[in-house]
Amino acid sequence: MNAPHTPHLNEADAAAAVEANAAEIGRRALTRREQKEAYENNKLFKRLVRQVGQAIGDYNMIEHGDKVMVCLSGGKDSYALLDILLRLRERAPIDFDLVAVNLDQKQPGFPEHVLPEYLTKIGVPFHIENQDTYSIVKRLVPEGKTTCSLCSRLRRGILYRVAGELGATKIALGHHRDDIVQTLLLNMFYGGKLKGMPPKLQSDDGKNIVIRPLAYAKETDLEKYAELREFPIIPCNLCGSQPNLKRAEMKALIRDWDKRFPGRVDNMFNALANVVPSHLMDTQLFPFAGLRATGEADPNGDIAFDEDPCGTGASAPGGAKSVSIVQFDDL
């Protein structure tokens, strides 16, 4: 009787098996990597939505019946602002409207089709304001000098006017945590002021309320979010203006601190909401001249000879008082 035939695995079959096994391992690794990326992306989205919702609640930025004019420049921050406000509106317990506004300043090479196409695609009402401020700035500012200051003033006046024409009750800007800290440092280093960039303010013409819903968001998170959402970014160097070197210096400083000293920038930001006027030097904020010993203990009194305890970390803006306009359990 013949012995049963045992098939032999030749070299080609063995190589194919190895390749198949390697491909399967690679597929599983890719799946795990994709799962991790999806998890991190979801965390990023939830974090940004939570931060924007908290900022809105802490400062009562948006109220029932508001019409919010979102200033859209084509940069990552304003795109993210509009995108997150749209998502928040779906879950908010109040009703409010959004309208996107872009000021086309007629810089050479500005891709004027990008924003209308994007906003039409996502179904957001919008208004494009065409004003040739570029020519005005170029005519008035000497060659080689930065045009940012004059350009900003012209842009601000136009946007305030447009807000009135559209019936907007709030004007939303895309400034974030890093912008606020940069402004604080710029005013300290170059202006001799303790002055930041408030999350909510009355405009200088007294007719508008300006809000910054991204106040609690980090720029690095917004960069990742813009990449994830694939926003059609319009470059910000079209005007050919000299860069704001002082602000760029502050930005680099903050990025460096974030890497080398985790938590430092967060504490600086939190300090803006934990001010002790009696321990500063502004006589307009605290009546130093009339200060007298009362004979009663004061919990806010100065220890005088002891070092003030530090390193415990400041509580975040809003603290326990924060009220969110959205529930996050279903995100």
From Swiss-Prot:
Database matches in PANTHER family: AMINOTRAN_5 DOMAIN-CONTAINING PROTEIN, SULFURTRANSFERASE-RELATED
Record note on cofactor: Binds 1 [4Fe-4S] cluster per subunit. The cluster is chelated by three Cys residues, the fourth Fe has a free coordination site that may bind a sulfur atom transferred from the persulfide of IscS.
Cofactors that this protein relies on: Mg(2+); [4Fe-4S] cluster
Name of the protein this chain belongs to: tRNA-cytidine(32) 2-sulfurtransferase
Pfam families to which the protein is assigned, alphabetical: ATP_bind_3 (PF01171)
Its EC number(s): 2.8.1.-
Family affiliation: Belongs to the TtcA family.
Catalytic activity annotation: cytidine(32) in tRNA + S-sulfanyl-L-cysteinyl-[cysteine desulfurase] + AH2 + ATP = 2-thiocytidine(32) in tRNA + L-cysteinyl-[cysteine desulfurase] + A + AMP + diphosphate + H(+)
GO biological process: tRNA thio-modification
Gene Ontology CC: cytoplasm
Phylogenetic placement of the source organism: Bacteria, Pseudomonadati, Pseudomonadota, Betaproteobacteria, Burkholderiales
Pathway annotation from the record: tRNA modification
Main localization, broad class: cytoplasm
Subcellular location, record wording: Cytoplasm
Subunit field text: Homodimer.
Keyword Cell cycle recorded: no
